[in-house]
Amino acid sequence: MTVFEAYITNLGKYAEGQLVGETLKFPATTEEVQSLLKNIGVDGVRYEEFFITAFDGDVMGLYDYLTEYENLDELNHLAHLISELDSDEIETLEAALNKGDHTSSVADIINLVHNLDCYSLHPGVTDDETLGRIYVEDMELLDVPDNVLPYFDFEAYGRDMRINEGGHFAPTGYLTRSGDFKEVYHLSLIHISEPTRPY
């Protein structure tokens, strides 16, 4: 299963005015990476460096945080982790990415994937009024008498709750933090198991 793709370009040839590159699908095997590098002329002798000119895939918001000089091993590790997520976890990841939580590097995003259980996502909740109604009518967090309910300002209540709990409206729903974030991964190949380290 392809999680995302990256267009890998030979940096030396690019500096010479030639655009030589190919698409690599992640997760990738060592053989796929080595074959791609050979095909684009990155041989470790004349041409040693490459860069990524484009990313593509279905995880909304992920590519906003990936740069042209990302580590292929880390990208592959991230792709393996994402491939193991179910659809609800993908939606939570997309909401956290939309919020900008832990997105300063691929290592941060790897840690974000490891900590998705620290978040609660309420799918389809995209405005303060809906949030206020859910908290008052469904979850009964506030006891509002029936005769006052038609006049109650659900939008103001929802806004206050969102501000107080540090919530965020994302395209996939309303996101809150519900646990302590633990840094599991550090930029080190020690943390990347052999099957996910292609380069």
Please place each PLM-identified region on the residue numbering.
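Short, flexible loop/turn elements at secondary-structure junctions
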Residues: N10-K13, A28, D56, A156, ...
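N-terminal ordered "arm"
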Residues: M1-R46
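Extracellular/secreted glycoprotein ectodomains characterized by long, lumenal stretches
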Residues: E70, S83-E91, A95, T103-S105, ...
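Single conserved hydrophobic/aromatic residue that forms the stacking wall/gate
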Residues: I190-Y199
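Short, glycine-biased loop/turn motifs at secondary-structure junctions and
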Residues: T9, A15-G21, I40, M139, ...
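Structured domain cores in non-transmembrane regions
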Residues: V33-D101
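Amphipathic protein-protein interaction modules
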Residues: N111-H168
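Long, highly charged low-complexity segments enriched in Glu/Asp and Lys/Arg with interspersed Ser/Thr
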Residues: I163-L189
